Amino acid sequence: IIKQGEEVERMHTPLAYLRAKIRSADEDGAVSVRQLEDTDAIVIHDKKERIVTYIYEYEGKLRELYASEEVKPMLSAGTSLFTVYDFEAQENGGLLQVSIHDEQGKASRMMMELKSE
């Protein structure tokens, strides 16, 4: 039971973090998904500060990178947040879908409606 609880928490925590991060930044046009070096990335624009936050998977870790709008992001430069496998993000018609997998291939997913579009 403890092991099962740890597995659920390990998969829930990254998705809860993403949900909170996106909700706190979601305003018209601020959140999108794009490819960085063939990797899905959630992109959050802070238009006032002209800062972009990228959230993506690199080398088995969910990472976060803050950069100026003018700087080309490098995946290796992000701060490691959580161990995840096979991170996928899609945005379609104002609906953000994210899935992550654990080391056994079990998927956890979330969907959020975005204010942006």
Predicted regions and their residues:
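General N-terminal targeting signals
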Residues: 15, 72, 79, 113-115
